[in-house]
Amino acid sequence: MLAIAILAWGQAGVAINEQNMKFERGVKPDPIKVKPPVDNTIPIDTSTVYFALIDSAQQCIKLEQWQQAEHFLLEAIRSEPSNPSNSLLLSNIATMQRQQGRLNEALRNYSMAIDITPNAVTLLHNRAAVYILLDSIARAQADYERIMMIDESDVESRYTHGMLALNMGDAKTAQKDFNDILRINPNSGMAKQGQGYLHKHAGEYDKAAQCFSEVINVKPSATLLANRADCYLATKRLNDASLDIANALELDPDDPYIYILRAKLNKLRYNRNDMERDIKLAIAHGLDAAEARAMIGE
């Protein structure tokens, strides 16, 4: 007996991250790692066609031959349509489709996998991530609420649920979610980070910067440094903002919003040439030109 192979998570995982959360800079969270699809220790009969097809799919996955891997997994499902392990295979198919930008197909396959294993928390996390990519925020929220009912200790669902609520202006729900995280884990950096976004949303920039600092001192990230820099810009602590922006760019030189922050800094310092340079850099890193200028009031 062997275990069903799953995707190498570094190759084709669905994580809730800065790209698929689509938050504005003011409330964009750090990435949250999501575990691999489901249990990878389900025993199967190695003598069956089902296993042989899965083994072929795994070989393709190792070579990042996603379409061929998908073909073998679909053939495995067709060979044993009532096999409960098909939930895992559908999840792998959905993950590969998500990596290829085939979001509607990924959504359909995650949903079929959930129909087989309705309480699989990781599948619900992954479907919620696709809903976010598709701007179906209400449906993503519903999946996170379902996760919270299944597993009260799942802090990632509460954090992302709270961040989505905050992004829609619902600070009350966000506060409840972050308080619930503190109830589960009084020392949670995730809750402290969420509180920082709440303070920033309310215009309480000094309090927000303090919350971000507590998390940065333990685990610095480009996102948190950029958000703290934004708070420092709002309170005219320009030297502190400059340092955070420089450190954020070292960690993530491809984030266009960090160049926008530096453009704002240069505008406040009346360095117009440097401001224009940073606007161009933000555009070169993928930000729409009109949006870039609007963000710094140009």
How would you name each of these model-derived features?
Residues R25, N40-I44, I260-E298:
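Terminal, low-structured helical/coil segments at or just beyond the last alpha-helical repeat
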Residues Y50, P84-L88, V121-T122, V155-E156, ...:
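Helix-start (N-cap) detector for alpha-helical repeat units in TPR-like alpha-solenoids
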Residues K62-L63, M96-Q99, L133-L134, N167-M168, ...:
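Register position in tetratricopeptide repeats
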